[in-house]
Curated annotation (Swiss-Prot):
Alphabetized InterPro entries for the sequence: PLC-like_Pdiesterase_TIM-brl (IPR017946)
Protein name: Dermonecrotic toxin SpaSicTox-betaIF1
Domain of life where this protein originates: Eukaryota
Disulfide bridge partners, by residue number: C35-C41, C37-C179
Biological role stated in the UniProt entry: Dermonecrotic toxins cleave the phosphodiester linkage between the phosphate and headgroup of certain phospholipids (sphingolipid and lysolipid substrates), forming an alcohol (often choline) and a cyclic phosphate. This toxin acts on sphingomyelin (SM). It may also act on ceramide phosphoethanolamine (CPE), lysophosphatidylcholine (LPC) and lysophosphatidylethanolamine (LPE), but not on lysophosphatidylserine (LPS), and lysophosphatidylglycerol (LPG). It acts by transphosphatidylation, releasing exclusively cyclic phosphate products as second products.
GO molecular function, one term: metal ion binding
Cofactor note: Binds 1 Mg(2+) ion per subunit.
E.C. number(s) listed in UniProt: 4.6.1.-
Similarity comment: Belongs to the arthropod phospholipase D family. Class II subfamily.
């Protein structure tokens, strides 16, 4: 229901909040309290069911196919998990993607950004990659990108990617719940890092959750690659006017989400 609603009003990407049991099994797409203002925080769906539904609407030829939905962000709720459970969570997400999203041999075409809160939670990445390689899923790495979402020091995030030997397919988020206002200092720093010659660890920058017209425009003026909003129709409206119409457009499937765009 919510997927159809947001895609219907113009969203080309969706965020799913993924909750886990204590062993690292992904259970529900669910946020819980607190969440963004003016949103229902308590809706939930089984993770496997959600993945299967977005598979259908991102598969060309499926009766439910929606051409504009091209990008899915998994906001992983990992903060209560012990290291062994983080590793298991990585295995489980990789396994569920292969069974519930790519089960038609990869005909479903969306790209996934896997958003991990903290750099201390890299056991998740280890588990995910181990399962990919064990099961021969390497061809799907092209569909996977990475993000650390807890607004940590950008140099620490860069060092973590180096340690993990990740040199591409990375987005950097910066943001806070729409209930609060946040300065743009770190967001600006991330954009500067993205645009530094020789940078190989940061491809794209996005801001969240921006719902006011002025906040969305400010982020675009700074040069972000994406905006997460509870009101995607406002972004569509902004991009249809003035200088924004000249400088920006909504991404389509033909665009590479891992390629740094030079303005």
């Amino acid at each position: 229901e919510m997927v159809d609603y947001y895609v219907g009003i113009g969203a080309n990407g969706l965020e799913m909040d993924v909750s886990f049991d204590s062993n690292g099994k992904a259970e529900y797409t669910y946020h819980g309290v607190p969440c963004d203002c003016f949103r229902s925080c308590t809706r939930s769906e089984k993770f496997s069911v959600y993945l299967d539904y977005v598979r259908q609407i991102t598969t060309p030829g499926n009766p439910k196919f929606r051409e504009n939905l091209i990008f899915l962000i998994m906001d992983l709720k990992l903060n209560d998990l012990e290291p062994h459970a983080l590793y298991n969570a990585g295995i489980d997400i990789a396994d569920q993607l292969s069974k519930n999203y790519w089960k038609d041999d990869g005909k479903a075409r969306a790209h996934f950004l896997i958003s991990i809160p903290y750099v201390s939670q890299t056991a998740f990445v280890d588990g995910f990659r181990w399962w990919f390689e064990k099961k021969g899923l390497e061809k799907y790495y092209e569909k996977i990108g990475w993000d650390f979402s807890a607004n940590e020091d950008l140099n620490s995030i860069q060092a973590t990617y180096q340690k993990l030997n990740i040199t591409g397919h990375t987005w950097q988020s910066d943001g806070i719940t729409n209930c609060l206002t946040r300065g743009t200092e770190r967001l600006t720093q991330a954009i500067q890092k993205r645009d530094t010659p020789g940078n190989s660890y940061l491809n794209k920058v996005y801001a969240w959750s921006l719902d006011k017209y002025g906040s969305i425009k400010q982020a675009l003026d700074l040069g972000v690659d994406g905006v997460m909003s509870n009101y995607p129709q406002r972004m569509v409206e902004i991009l249809s006017e003035g200088t924004y119409l000249e400088r920006f457009r909504l991404a389509t499937y033909e665009d590479n989400p891992w390629e740094t765009f030079k303005q």
